[in-house]
C-alpha cells in the first residue's frame, strides 16, 4: 500500500486546512519544494500536490511551484489536483512531467468531461470524490451536491479513469481517524483502485486501512498528521509497504 504525503499549496506556501475552509489554515512551510524533498528522502514513492487557490479560482494558481517540485523530485510519481477544469490545464501538467491529474468539481458538474479526457489522456486521470454522509461535495467543499458517491464512482470507472481518491471531508484535517467503513464500501463497489484520504492520523489508521487492501484500497494520503507529528511518516510508510 502506498503512503502518500500531501502538500497543499496556498499563496506558494505549504499549508493544511481544516475541513476545506480556506480561512482556517495552518502554514507549515514557506518552501514547499524543500518539504517535497524531505518526504522523498524519507522514502515516499508518490506525492499528492493540491493547488488550493486553484480549487477555489477554477484555474491553476500554484503551477510554478508544482513544476519546481517536479524538477526537484524527478524519481517519484506526482499527482496534482486543484483547479483542473479544462484540457489545456491537463496537457500543461502532463507536459511538465506530472504523472496523474486529479479532477474533482468538473467531474461532478460536467460528467461528459471525464469520458472526454480519459480518451484524450489515457492512464493519467484520477477522480477526487470528496463526500460527507455519502454525498459528493464540490467547489472546494463549499457546496454539497445531491450525487451519491458510489453511483458517481461507478460511472467514472466505466469512463476509464485510473483510480478514485476518496476523501471523507467530515474527517479531513480534524485528526479524528479515517472512515474505514465508508472507504471499504466504496472500494468494494468498484473495480478500480481507491486511495483513501481524510482523517489519517496515527499508525493505527494505517493498520486499519491495511486490513481493507483486499477491497481495492491501494494507498492512503496523509497531511496534517505528518506535519504535526502524530504519525511518523517513515514508520507509517514501512508499515504500509507490508500490505
Swiss-Prot record:
Its EC number is 5.3.1.16. One of its GO terms (molecular function) is 1-(5-phosphoribosyl)-5-[(5-phosphoribosylamino)methylideneamino]imidazole-4-carboxamide isomerase activity. Disulfide bonds: none annotated. GO terms for cellular component: cytoplasm. It comes from the Bacteria. GO terms for biological process: L-histidine biosynthetic process; L-tryptophan biosynthetic process. It is found in: Cytoplasm. Keywords: Amino-acid biosynthesis, Cytoplasm, Histidine biosynthesis, Isomerase. InterPro entries: Aldolase_TIM, His_biosynth, HisA_bact_arch, Isoase_HisA-like, Isoase_HisA-like_bact, RibuloseP-bd_barrel. The active site is at 8 (proton acceptor), 130 (proton donor). Coiled coil: none annotated. It catalyses: 1-(5-phospho-beta-D-ribosyl)-5-[(5-phospho-beta-D-ribosylamino)methylideneamino]imidazole-4-carboxamide = 5-[(5-phospho-1-deoxy-D-ribulos-1-ylimino)methylamino]-1-(5-phospho-beta-D-ribosyl)imidazole-4-carboxamide. Pathway: Amino-acid biosynthesis; L-histidine biosynthesis; L-histidine from 5-phospho-alpha-D-ribose 1-diphosphate: step 4/9. Belongs to the HisA/HisF family. This is 1-(5-phosphoribosyl)-5-[(5-phosphoribosylamino)methylideneamino] imidazole-4-carboxamide isomerase. It comes from Methylococcus capsulatus (strain ATCC 33009 / NCIMB 11132 / Bath).
